Amino acid sequence: MTQVTVGENEGIESALRRFKRQVSKSGIFADLKRLRHHETPIEKYKRKLQQRRKARRR
């Protein structure tokens, strides 16, 4: 979960910018868009395979 604490001398606009940056880095919206529709078993297999490859590279 993404959280942003607003400092005493910080404006709402800058906190909102930081929040948007954190959300885009974490990939939350990309996951929502991808999982919005039904996923066939072969698509699910390919997605999991790609996730494993990405995790192995790290």
UniProtKB/Swiss-Prot annotation:
GO molecular function, one term: structural constituent of ribosome
GO cellular component: ribonucleoprotein complex; ribosome
GO biological process: translation
Gene3D superfamilies membership: Ribosomal protein S8 (1.20.5.1150)
Key words of the record: Ribonucleoprotein, Ribosomal protein
Superkingdom of source: Bacteria
HAMAP family: Ribosomal_bS21
Sequence similarity: Belongs to the bacterial ribosomal protein bS21 family.
Family matches, as NCBIfam families: S21p
The protein, known as: Small ribosomal subunit protein bS21
Underlying gene: rpsU
